[in-house]
UniProtKB/Swiss-Prot annotation:
Belongs to the KAE1 / TsaD family. Substrate binds at residues 134-138, 167, 180, 270. It comes from Alkalilimnicola ehrlichii (strain ATCC BAA-1101 / DSM 17681 / MLHE-1). This is tRNA N6-adenosine threonylcarbamoyltransferase. GO terms for biological process: tRNA threonylcarbamoyladenosine modification. It is an enzyme of class 2 (transferase).
Length: 339
């Protein structure tokens, strides 16, 4: 089965073709960073308009790279949610129209499920079951994954997501959008030991997260510091977030008895996080799995693969379609089971 994947949940337009026999044949991504930079964040209307401009050219591009034609596509998968409704509608409308025109099945997939399954596209994918940390600008979740659609949320953020905390802290430090990567760069020249920020909710049992208090502490520190202190503040903040994520993942491995840990989502590209998670996993005797850097952020490849996982079991949508801004991961069911 050859599946075209369409991702348009926020500010990146992603297209990809996944083949069950050949694997990932092609993927292409357009980031809207330049479009939103002057506003300091994503403007939903601008995001939707840019998806409209990009989705067809990117489709042509992946078809050319894969060396196939539209009639070679057996199914189309698209991101149904969660995300920005207008942006989701662009991808969903294109995908459903194309599927209808080709006479092939279509399926709307869950954005977070696609992130969870992204490491399956790597040469050494994790076997089920595993524990996954999904850490991005919009989500921070610890999930026990028994199989496709078989998820148990172990912990989640009670307020800001880790990526959101990175972006907001970067803004406090006067860094340009997108803030997360810029903060990581600044932190490289800083001393993380100069400031001691809290490791939120690590002093009590449980696997939930909270980053709003840490953000407030950083704000207070910035207000009392000089411009020359910014790198040290960035390094101390990054260290606090990474320590928190590592501690919670260690707890999750112990609580579940799992020997496999998956890190996915945009924050999973952070170098310090990868380094510290590797050290912790080695100490715990667990294998550590990431998607390649290009597949940490939103992309069409993970959508195409997730669509294939479900479509190959006979699941598909009817002609009516909807998108959803909010869609709890716990609402998903395994392929073949009623929703």
């Amino acid at each position: 089965m050859r599946v075209l994947g369409v991702e348009s949940s926020c500010d990146e337009t992603g297209l990809a073709i996944y083949d069950s026999a050949q694997g990932l044949m092609a993927h292409a991504l357009h980031s809207q960073v330049a479009t939103h930079a002057e506003y300091g964040g994503v403007v939903p209307e601008l995001a939707s308009r840019d998806h409209v401009r990009r989705v067809v050219p990117l489709t042509r591009r992946v078809l050319a790279e894969a060396g196939c034609r539209l009639r070679d596509i057996d199914a189309v998968a698209y991101t149904r949610g969660p995300g920005l409704v207008g942006a989701l509608m662009v991808g969903a409308g294109m995908a459903r129209s194309l599927a209808w025109g080709l006479g092939v099945p279509a399926l709307g997939v869950h954005h977070m499920e696609a992130h969870l399954l992204a490491p399956m596209l790597e040469p050494n994918p994790p076997a089920f079951p595993f524990v996954a940390l999904l850490v991005s600008g919009g989500h921070t979740l610890l999930v026990q994954v028994a199989g496709v659609g078989r998820y148990r949320v172990l912990g989640e953020t009670l307020d800001d997501a880790a990526g959101e905390a990175f972006d907001k802290t970067a803004k406090l430090l006067g860094l340009p959008y997108p803030g997360g990567p810029e903060l990581e760069k600044l932190a490289e020249s800083g001393d993380p030991g100069r400031y001691r920020f809290p490791r939120p909710m690590t002093d009590r049992p449980g696997l939930d997260f909270s980053f709003s208090g840490l953000k407030t502490r950083v704000l207070q520190t910035v207000q009392q510091s000089r411009e020359a202190d910014r790198a040290d503040i960035a390094a101390a903040f990054q260290s606090a977030v990474v320590d928190t994520l590592v501690i919670k993942c260690r707890r999750a491995l112990r609580a579940t008895g799992s020997q496999r840990l998956v890190i996915s989502g945009g924050v999973g590209a952070n170098g310090l996080l990868r380094e510290q998670m590797r050290a912790m996993a080695d100490q715990a005797g667990a294998s550590l799995h990431y998607p390649r850097l290009a597949l940490c952020t939103d992309n069409g490849a993970m959508v195409a693969y997730t669509g294939w996982c479900r479509l190959s079991e006979g699941q598909h949508d009817d002609l009516d379609f909807s998108v959803t801004a909010r869609w709890p991961l716990a609402d998903l069911t395994p392929p073949g089971q009623p929703v």
